[in-house]
């Protein structure tokens, strides 16, 4: 297998080109309704409802599963969104664009006119768990939810709830038995005399990358 290869393009198409199988996939898809990348027809994240968004990602990860070894795993980072519907103004979820030239695009992703059934103004949608349960229904084994705790979260001006400072990382496996090296990720004990099992809350600072879509997620180089 070729290593250190970066492929550009739509993952829904590029995944079909793979000849070799991978043992692990680590990814963080575009979150629902939080950003406009300027490609209205093809981008993921501006669907008309959370359910449409989840269904699209289920299809993506179905292709991912086809490219995993039988003992392979999927590590999926996913953040949540709030429902924001104003009568007469529609549903405004997309607040910013990666590209300044796309921030004022007069497209459906900037303001949706439909009111979503089952959601109230200011509701936390619960997108990570909607996706997790949908992937489980599609055949994935949902093995664990990991909390990514952010010591330096994005400031929020909201005054009627706590500042959001965590996201989810889900561990999925293709089959019941899969590769997981528990010893490789053990952490030092408090006294420094031994090692202990890694726990399911990971404290990782976010780091800005001005040339990388202003986005970051925890990686194997951020193990703490």
Question: Where are the regions a protein language model picked out?
Answer:
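A SAM-dependent methyltransferase catalytic signature shared across enzymes that methylate proteins
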Residues: 131-144
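Flexible, glycine-/basic-rich loop-and-beta segments that form/coincide
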Residues: 143, 149-201
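Feature marks short, surface-exposed loop/turn motifs that line or immediately flank catalytic pockets
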Residues: 31-35, 82-84, 149-152, 176, ...
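Short, solvent-exposed loop/turn and secondary-structure capping segments
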Residues: 35-38, 86-89, 147, 182-184, ...
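Short loop/turn elements that flank and shape the SAM/SAH-binding pocket of Class I
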Residues: 12-16
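Single conserved hydrophobic/aromatic residue that forms the stacking wall/gate
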Residues: 215-224
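SAM-dependent methyltransferase catalytic-core segment centered on the flexible catalytic loop
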Residues: 11, 21-122
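Conserved SAM-binding strand-loop segment of SAM-dependent methyltransferases
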Residues: 4-10
């Amino acid at each position: 297998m070729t290593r250190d290869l970066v492929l550009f393009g739509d993952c829904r198409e590029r995944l079909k080109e793979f000849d070799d199988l991978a043992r692990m996939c680590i990814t963080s898809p575009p979150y629902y309704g939080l950003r406009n990348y300027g490609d209205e027809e093809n981008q993921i994240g501006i669907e008309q409802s959370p359910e449409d968004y989840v269904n699209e990602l289920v299809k993506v990860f179905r292709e991912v599963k086809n490219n995993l070894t039988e003992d392979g795993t999927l590590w999926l980072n996913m953040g949540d969104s709030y429902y924001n519907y104003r009568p007469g103004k529609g549903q405004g979820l997309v607040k910013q664009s990666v590209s300044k030239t796309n921030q004022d695009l007069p497209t459906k992703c900037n303001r949706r006119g439909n009111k979503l059934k089952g959601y109230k103004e200011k509701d936390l949608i619960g997108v990570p768990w909607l996706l997790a349960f949908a992937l489980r229904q599609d055949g994935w084994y949902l093995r664990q939810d990991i909390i990514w705790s952010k010591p330096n979260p994005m400031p929020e001006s909201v005054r009627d709830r706590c500042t959001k400072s965590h996201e989810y990382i889900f561990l999925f496996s293709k089959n019941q038995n899969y590769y997981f090296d528990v010893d490789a990720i053990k952490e030092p004990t408090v006294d420094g005399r031994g090692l202990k099992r890694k726990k399911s809350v990971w404290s990782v600072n976010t780091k800005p990358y001005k040339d990388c879509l202003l986005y970051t997620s925890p990686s194997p180089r951020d193990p703490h």
